[in-house]
């Protein structure tokens, strides 16, 4: 197993205010660091963040200032995890609600932060993702465009997705170019345990501590390997009996414990599901979104996972805390490009991501989600404005171990295990999607739904007249005279066919030339789906 890279995690134990050494600590930009303290006495309820509020104020180069929440980690041990956002010298001072608790309050220190590592993009550019200045995509912490290619492991972390399985999933998907995993694990981590996330901020006991320290190992592994987690808890209607205070208690602890990691938050799966229950829980969900945004010291991009598009009323879309829109096209159907265009054309744009569409292996009498369906769903979303795509697979999304114990997956078609879902061809073929888009400046591309005349089942995305990507759906029939319109007369383009199944490319030897502001569309190599990449050549 590859050695974990978070060697910059600092562990300093303070039994009293005189425990400081004279030398500055060492850390790395964009890597998780941790400070460890020992309280002078037991805290009755360490999850009560109003009466036991532990934090540190960090001051860094160029006036940087971060207030980072801390967390209880067993007995009298408390920690603060922090990701330095710039190289140079940082100073910090701790705060605790009870200023008389000198083991936790008023501790000061210095950290010398070295430039970032380059072993993974997350360590090089920072995994606390932000919204781009034009509100069309997400960026790494340093502003570098972030390409979202995600997989769905809703059951992680839990007994359905034990740590060794999680590691296999991370390793396979990273090798295929994936950058994100989505999960809403809230269940116990073994069959013998009774504590999951919702129970894990109620009592400061050994079972609770064991739960959190096991979850640590999941997120530490993903961070070390270079994969972003997009995380929530359960499903919206399951929050009905839980008070907003208890939800805030859970999220305050979660943010303190994992906020320094390269993670995003989707709050829950399907935050606005079930209209007959919605009024009982939806106001809590929206208020919780603002609480998460206000508590997160890094103000990272925040979203909420919605119900299927045909039933999604977009209640969170205009909330000030919602930074990007997560879309759910749903299953066993193809979403129309116009549905994505509507989101793209919002008066006050927010980036949007297709977060759940056609899990591979789902099947019905008239619709089989195979690799071709996966490609069509993914390329349609990106060509229509989504800044990425999240894949999902039967069995894998729910952590199925045994065909005889399928859980809810039996409703969606033939039962698969997580390992069978991980090996499906559509998931592997999406590595080529990322290669395709990263072969150009993908973040400069915009959907062009009216670029063709007459219209055809070819989706166009373009950077003005400089670079154009044309996705031909399978079995497309080009009408006579179909062309790209409104291009510079006489302009020549290098033209390349990109095969979404293999990643192979074939250049058109004569390229394409605009005549009378029209560029005739070439026919695809065969009846399967293809991407045509056009790159402007020199001066016309």
Q: Which residues does each predicted region cover?
A:
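Short tyrosine-centred short linear motifs in exposed loops/low-complexity segments
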Residues: 28-31, 76-78, 82-100, 476-480, ...
